[in-house]
């Protein structure tokens, strides 16, 4: 006999129950970015996932990026994007626009989407409650001809040096869902633009989060046959980087996962944000849909 839609929904909810119990009162940090942010239907599905996590007793925290939107705004305002070693240079004028786009328009759009579900989201950035302090990023690049390393001056691109969890702990005890933009102050009074992945990792590490989810445009880490690897230890991840299985843009993503685990996160997942309800499919099903990296 074919199941009715209501019977299927009931069965799926019953299967999800043990996972709801497993993650009750646990912190899950979700880095939201990639294609999902530009798709209205995926955006609504993401917001409903976050709302359901909260309703299930989970403490969800959203960290978001916004690279394409920043680029579009800079173009609109006639400001040329400059790059050093493939990394965006953020001068004073640019960092003001970065803050406007990240902590302003994008942040509030995500907050509004979650609030439309009936939950209560609040938009923040690293400046709020002195949550995050940063310092100027120190990046180097090796000249392929001379093999000499030189230091890149990326302007107001920062790295997290301190996370104060006080505000986030207060919010965890409330009904509110934090949505955080990766902008933070330095002790020097400057404002810094921080890579959203590393920012999310720092937040998750400071909170000893049970899970950190990276929503990307790919299914996860793939083996040399192109098949999804469901779970990796840190040691196995290092080995796959060394033998070239993990390559290109996936290397910094996996390295960020490893750093987050070293900082205290219990498990980090790279998953496909282009799949509707990807967060629920990862958290509330037995095998998840991405690659789980564990200590």
UniProtKB/Swiss-Prot annotation:
- Per the annotation, which location comes first and is thus the protein's main one? cytoplasm
The family annotation for this protein states: Belongs to the acetylglutamate kinase family. ArgB subfamily.
Q: Which reaction does it catalyse?
A: N-acetyl-L-glutamate + ATP = N-acetyl-L-glutamyl 5-phosphate + ADP
Q: Where is the protein found, in the record's own terms?
A: Cytoplasm
Give the domain of life: Bacteria
Q: What class of enzyme is it?
A: transferase
Binding of substrate occurs at: 66-67, 88, 193
Biological process terms in GO annotation? arginine biosynthetic process via ornithine; L-arginine biosynthetic process
Q: Report the GO molecular function annotations.
A: acetylglutamate kinase activity; ATP binding
Q: What is its EC number?
A: 2.7.2.8
Q: What job does the chain carry out?
A: Catalyzes the ATP-dependent phosphorylation of N-acetyl-L-glutamate.
- Kindly give the InterPro entries that the UniProt entry links to this protein: AceGlu_kinase-like_sf, AcgluKinase_fam, ArgB, Asp/Glu/Uridylate_kinase, Glu/AcGlu_kinase, NAGK-C
Gene Ontology cellular-component terms for this entry are: cytoplasm
- Whether Transferase counts among this entry's keywords is yes
Kindly give the Pfam families that the UniProt entry links to this protein: AA_kinase
- Pathway it belongs to? Amino-acid biosynthesis; L-arginine biosynthesis; N(2)-acetyl-L-ornithine from L-glutamate: step 2/4
Write down the Gene3D superfamilies for this protein, in alphabetical order: Acetylglutamate kinase-like
Q: Where is this site: Transition state stabilizer?
A: 31, 253
The name under which this protein is listed is: Acetylglutamate kinase
Encoding gene, per UniProt annotation: argB
């Amino acid at each position: 006999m074919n199941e009715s839609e209501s019977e299927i929904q009931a069965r799926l909810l019953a299967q999800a129950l043990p996972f709801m119990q497993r993650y009750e009162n646990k912190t899950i940090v979700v880095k939201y970015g990639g294609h999902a942010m530009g798709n209205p239907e995926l955006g609504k599905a993401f917001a409903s996932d976050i709302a359901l996590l909260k309703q299930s007793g989970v403490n969800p925290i959203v960290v978001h990026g916004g690279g394409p939107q920043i680029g579009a705004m800079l173009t609109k305002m006639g400001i040329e994007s400059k790059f050093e070693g493939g990394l965006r240079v953020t001068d004073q004028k640019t960092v003001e626009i970065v803050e406007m786009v990240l902590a302003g328009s994008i942040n509030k759009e995500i907050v509004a989407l979650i609030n439309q579900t009936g939950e209560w989201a609040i938009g923040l950035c690293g400046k709020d409650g002195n949550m995050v302090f940063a310092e100027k990023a120190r990046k180097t690049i090796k000249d392929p001809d001379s093999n000499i390393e030189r230091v890149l001056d990326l302007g107001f691109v920062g790295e997290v040096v301190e996370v104060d969890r006080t505000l986030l702990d207060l919010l965890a005890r409330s009904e509110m869902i934090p949505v955080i933009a990766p902008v933070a102050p330095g002790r020097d009074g400057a404002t810094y633009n921080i890579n959203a992945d590393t920012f999310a990792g720092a937040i998750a590490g400071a909170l000893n989060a049970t899970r950190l989810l990276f929503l990307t445009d790919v299914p996860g880490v793939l083996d040399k046959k192109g098949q999804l690897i469901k779970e990796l230890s840190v040691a196995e991840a290092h080995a796959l980087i060394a033998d070239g299985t993990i390559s290109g843009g996936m290397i910094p993503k996996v390295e960020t996962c490893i750093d987050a685990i070293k900082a205290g996160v219990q498990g980090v997942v790279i998953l496909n944000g282009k799949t509707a309800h990807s967060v629920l499919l990862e958290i509330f099903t037995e095998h998840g849909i991405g690659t789980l990296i564990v200590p």
